[in-house]
């Protein structure tokens, strides 16, 4: 079996709407160390689900996306110690994640068992002083604002860039968040 065909852990993310993704990914490309920036901007919901769950994960993501997108907003600039992120607030997205966590409860890693702090990483694996400087710079102009969540996706993780496994887009009407 080739490395590309070998079973790989599944990562689950929320997908941003086009304009929000372009903006967040532009920040990430501008500030993430280029030699480590293998991924576009994303919101991770689960870091490591067993590869054997792919069919069930795909079915559940499609079912969850049959309704409207969860309201969400960018709440603040977060300092991660050696990086910077944008904190995402969305009780509805957290409820979707909790539904998935309940379904896969016995199969979650300790990291995925914990309640996540939803965020979009802009910079990571830099010196703490560089992270603090970027956080200060981003906070100067940052204002909380709505964030469009367009869908959910599953990815294969094989140690490098993630490989898409499936994508499901929300089909219901969008609800604005103040």
Q: Where do the protein language model's features map onto the residues?
A:
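Charge-rich, low-complexity N-terminal segments
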Residues: 82-87
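Basic, often amphipathic N-terminal segments
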Residues: 1-71, 91-151, 161-178
């Amino acid at each position: 079996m080739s490395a590309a065909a070998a079973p790989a852990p599944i990562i689950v993310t929320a997908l941003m709407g086009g304009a929000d993704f372009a903006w967040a990914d532009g920040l990430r490309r501008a500030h993430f160390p280029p030699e480590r920036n293998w991924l576009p901007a994303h919101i991770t919901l689960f870091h490591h689900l067993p590869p054997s769950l792919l069919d069930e994960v795909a079915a559940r993501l499609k079912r969850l996306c049959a309704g409207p997108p969860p309201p969400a907003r960018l709440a603040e600039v977060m300092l991660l110690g050696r990086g910077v992120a944008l904190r995402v607030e969305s009780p509805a997205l957290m409820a979707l994640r909790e539904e998935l966590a309940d379904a896969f409860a016995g199969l979650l890693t300790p990291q995925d068992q914990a309640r996540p702090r939803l965020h979009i990483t802009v910079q990571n694996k830099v010196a703490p002083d560089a992270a603090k400087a970027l956080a200060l710079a981003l906070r100067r102009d940052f204002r909380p604002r709505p964030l469009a969540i367009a869908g959910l996706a599953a990815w294969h993780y094989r140690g490098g860039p993630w490989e898409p496994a499936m994508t499901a887009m929300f089909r219901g009407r969008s609800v604005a968040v103040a």
